[in-house]
Amino acid sequence: MKRPYKRKRKRGPVQSKKVSYDGINFASGLERYMYMALKNAKIKSKYEGETFVLLNGFHFENEVYERCANGKGEYKNRGCKRILPIKYTPDFIGDGFIIETKGRANESFPMRWKLFKQLVMRQFPNTTLYKPQNQKECDETVRLILSYLK
């Protein structure tokens, strides 16, 4: 007996699955792995503990002719609006370090990451940034943090 054709849903560029562990909802399995590695090494950190404003919001008073952000809709004046701030929430914040686990970056991440690096350099000069992209790099990150804490 032939199975009926099942149409696959189109997925976006980021294909991470949401995972729960210890009562915390993680955005990906890699974030959960990092949390477990930090916990096993007894390194204190907060998961998504703080949100940083990379660029303040403002009121755009000029006229601007464009379509909606999704490229649809009518081409018309969409100016004179409040522009929202650009914010960034790293995955883990600890004493002297910030960790951003990133499997596959989305479209806006590279720009946010550069702006965040600039903010850290100016406001937190003695903070080390880590961006592990797989479990091996998560383990290496924990090793580096432990050697730094000694």
Feature names for model-found ranges:
Residues M1-K150:
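Electrostatic, structured charged patches in enzyme active sites and in nucleic-acid/phosphate-binding
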